[in-house]
UniProtKB/Swiss-Prot annotation:
Keyword field contains Electron transport: no
Organism name: Morus indica (Mulberry)
GO biological process: photosynthesis
Gene assigned in the entry: psbJ
Name of the protein described by the UniProt record: Photosystem II reaction center protein J
Subunit field text: PSII is composed of 1 copy each of membrane proteins PsbA, PsbB, PsbC, PsbD, PsbE, PsbF, PsbH, PsbI, PsbJ, PsbK, PsbL, PsbM, PsbT, PsbX, PsbY, PsbZ, Psb30/Ycf12, at least 3 peripheral proteins of the oxygen-evolving complex and a large number of cofactors. It forms dimeric complexes.
Subcellular location: Plastid, Chloroplast thylakoid membrane
Length: 40
């Protein structure tokens, strides 16, 4: 964890990836419950 200079820390990548994945899953379930996901 010492040489994070010039590179993005791993926990930031994990946090951003987790937020994106949760957001996509939330949008997918919201669309399917709204009837928009049935056409996909």
């Amino acid at each position: 964890m010492a040489d994070t200079t010039g590179r993005i820390p791993l926990w930031i990548i994990g946090t951003v990836t987790g937020i994106i994945v949760i957001g996509l899953i939330g949008i997918f379930f919201y669309g399917s419950y709204s009837g928009l996901g049935s056409s996909l």
